[in-house]
From Swiss-Prot:
It comes from Frankia alni (strain DSM 45986 / CECT 9034 / ACN14a). InterPro entries: KH_dom-like_a/b, RbfA, RbfA_dom_sf, Ribosome-bd_factorA_CS. The gene is rbfA. One of several proteins that assist in the late maturation steps of the functional core of the 30S ribosomal subunit. Associates with free 30S ribosomal subunits (but not with 30S subunits that are part of 70S ribosomes or polysomes). Required for efficient processing of 16S rRNA. May interact with the 5'-terminal helix region of 16S rRNA. GO terms for molecular function: ribosomal small subunit binding. Belongs to the RbfA family. This is Ribosome-binding factor A. Monomer. Binds 30S ribosomal subunits, but not 50S ribosomal subunits or 70S ribosomes. It is found in: Cytoplasm. The keyword Acetylation does not apply. Residues 119-141 have a biased composition (Basic and acidic residues). Residues 119-203 are annotated as: Disordered. One of its GO terms (biological process) is maturation of SSU-rRNA. Residues 142-169 have a biased composition (Acidic residues).
């Protein structure tokens, strides 16, 4: 009967045994700096896949793979003695490309960041080739003079309106004075009109 929990526990133990054996027990000169990254055991505890990485170039990886294949029987025997299981799982060694892929991805991200930084610096120092607003027509001296002339005309018109109002007010006051003089000659008292009031008030 499959027992996933037991398979995980056995995988951890196999990883420890194989890593220790590669460090102390295997004397193959082809074996490089090998690191056991993970071990997966099937639920029936029959097969174990050992994932590993090798520090170095492609030649170092190839030589280490050959050394592991040669030492597979020895390593399986040590696993059987260390774990005490009835049937020692077969060992299959697989080069773990995940760290290499992760490093490659980090390198790509680093290159992209450097490129973005250079582009940002270029944009910061860039200046527009033309005017900021190419559709904005600059004002001319003649247009400025026309605006000043229009302002002067408006001021003169306002001054004329004020004089007209003053003249109308003077005519109204003069009419009241004439009425008072005519009334006095006729022996009557004439009162000036007061807006909103009674002209006879105060007699």
């Amino acid at each position: 009967m499959a027992d996933p929990a037991r398979a995980r526990k056995l995988a951890v133990r196999i990883r420890e045994v194989v890593a220790s054996a590669l460090e102390r027990g295997v004397k193959d000169p082809r074996l490089g700096m090998v690191t056991v990254t993970e071990v997966r055991v099937t639920p029936d505890l029959v097969d174990a896949t050992v994932f590993y990485t090798v520090y170095g170039d492609e030649d170092a990886r190839r030589a280490s793979a050959e050394a592991l294949e040669s030492a597979r029987g020895l390593l399986r025997s040590q696993v059987g003695r260390a774990t005490g299981v009835k049937v020692t799982p077969t060992l299959t060694f697989v080069h773990d490309r995940l760290p290499d892929d992760a490093k490659h991805l980090e390198d790509l991200i680093s290159v992209a960041r450097e490129r973005d930084a250079r582009l940002a610096e270029v944009r910061r120092d860039a200046r527009p080739a033309g005017d900021e607003d190419p559709y904005r027509r600059p004002r001319t001296v003649d247009e400025d003079d026309e605006d000043e002339d229009e302002d002067l005309v408006d001021e003169f018109d306002e001054f004329d309106r004020v004089e007209e109002l003053d003249a109308d007010a003077g005519d109204a006051l003069g009419g009241d004075a004439g009425a008072r003089e005519a009334g006095a000659s006729a022996g009557r008292q004439v009162y000036p009109a007061s807006p909103g009031g009674d002209p006879t008030a105060g007699r």
